Amino acid sequence: MKKNILLLFLVHGANYLFPFIVLPYQTRILSIETFADVAKIQAAVMLLSLIVNYGYNLSSTRAIARAVSQAEINKIYSETLIVKLLLATICLALGCVHLMYVKEYSLIYPFIISSIYLYGSALFATWLFQGLEKMKAVVIATTIAKLTGVILTFILVKSPNDIVAALFTQNIGMFISGIISIYLVRKNKYATVICFRLKNIIVSLKEAWPFFLSLAATSVYTYFNVILLSFYAGDYVVANFNAADKLRMAAQGLLIPIGQAVFPRLSKLEGYEYSSKLKIYAIRYAIFGVCISAGLVFLGPMLTTIYLGKEYSLSGEYLQSMFLLPATISISTILSQWMLIPQGKEKILSRIYILGAIVHLLYAFPLVYYYGAWGMVISILFTEVLIVLFMLKAVK
C-alpha cells in the first residue's frame, strides 16, 4: 500500500503542482475580469464533472477491488465507461442551454472548449487502476497530461483577454489523461469493453447513487461557492477568493492520495484486522491534516504575496482564514471513506451530505450578501465542522 500512496502522491502532485506553477503566470497575464470569468466557467465545469463521475470513482473502485474474475472486471469497466460518456454529453448540452437561457452568449464558446475536461474525466479510468492497485498507469497519464497543459499555457496565454486559451490549457490535461488511460488499459489488458445490458447499467447507477448524492451535496460548499460569490461580489473579490481557494485546495490535496490508497485496502478488511488498521491510519492522517492547517496559518499571507502578486493582496487574508479546513477534511475523510462506507452506511452518509448542503445554502446566501467573501469563508468552515459532527454521531 505504501507504493500506492507514493504513486497517488505523484498523481495529485501533478494535479496540483503543475496548476500551482501556472497560477501566478495567469494572475499576472490575465486581467482581473478575465481571471474571474475563467474561475466561474471552471467552477461550472467542475460541478458538471461531478455528474459525469456520478459516484463511480468510489462505487466502481470498490466493485473492482472485490471482483473475483476478469469477466466481472470487464463488465464493470464497460458499464462505467459508457455511462460516464453519456453523462458527459448530457452535461455539455445542459451547460450550453443554460448559458443561452441567461443570455451569456459570449461564454458559450469558452464553455464548449472547457467541456473537453468532461470527456477526459469520463475516459480516465482512475477507479479501475485504484481498484486493481495499478497506480503506476495513473501516474504516467497524469504527469504527461499536466505537463502538456503547463507548456501550452506559457505558449498560448499571452494577453489579458485570452479566456479561451486559458480555459483550453486548464482542461486539455484531463482529456489527454483520458486518452492515455484508454491506451494503457488496452495495452496491459486490464479490462476490455464488452457487450452490456441496459438492466445492468441501471443496477450500477443505483449502486453509485448514494456516492453521487454525497459528492453532489459536497459540491454545494466547494465548487458552487465561486458561482454564488459572483452573484453578489465584483470581479476583484471573486478573483482574489478563487486564487486563495486554489491554494487552499492545493495544500488540502496532499490528503487525497492517502485517503484514496487506504480506502480500497480497508474495504477488504473485517473485524479486528479492520479496527486495528483503521486506528493506525486515522491517527497519522489526522496529524497530517493538522500540520497542513498550521502551514496555512504561518505561511499563507507570505506565500500569496510572493506567489500571486500585489493585485491579489486579499488572497492572503482569505487563505489564512481557511486554516481549519485541512484538519477538518482529514477527520471527515476518516469518518466517511474509512468508516461509514466500509460499514455499508452509504445511505446515511448521503443524508449527512445532503443535509449539510441544504443547511449551507440557508446561511451562505445571506452571509455572502452581507459580508461578501468573508461570509463565504464562514459558511464553508461552519458547514464542514457541522458535517463532521453529524458523521461522529452516525459512526457511534
Swiss-Prot record:
Pfam family, one: Polysacc_synt
Disulfide bonds: none
Keyword Membrane on entry: yes
InterPro entries tied to this protein: Poly_Biosynth_Transport (IPR050833), Polysacc_synth (IPR002797)
Keyword Hydrolase carried by entry: no
Superkingdom assignment: Bacteria
Keywords (A to Z) from UniProt: Cell inner membrane, Cell membrane, Lipopolysaccharide biosynthesis, Membrane, Transmembrane, Transmembrane helix, Transport
GO biological process terms, semicolon-separated: O antigen biosynthetic process
Locations listed in the record: Cell inner membrane
Biological pathway: Bacterial outer membrane biogenesis; LPS O-antigen biosynthesis
GO cellular component, one term: plasma membrane
Segments passing through the bilayer: 5-25, 32-52, 82-102, 107-127, 137-157, 163-183, 211-231, 286-306, 322-342, 348-368, 372-392
Membrane topology category: Multi-pass membrane protein
Function of the protein: May be involved in the translocation process of the nascent O-polysaccharide molecules and/or its ligation to lipid A core units.
PANTHER family cross-referenced by the UniProt entry: O-ANTIGEN TRANSPORTER-RELATED, PST FAMILY PREDICTED COLANIC ACID TRANSPORTER
Family: Belongs to the polysaccharide synthase family.
UniProt-recorded name of the protein: Putative O-antigen transporter
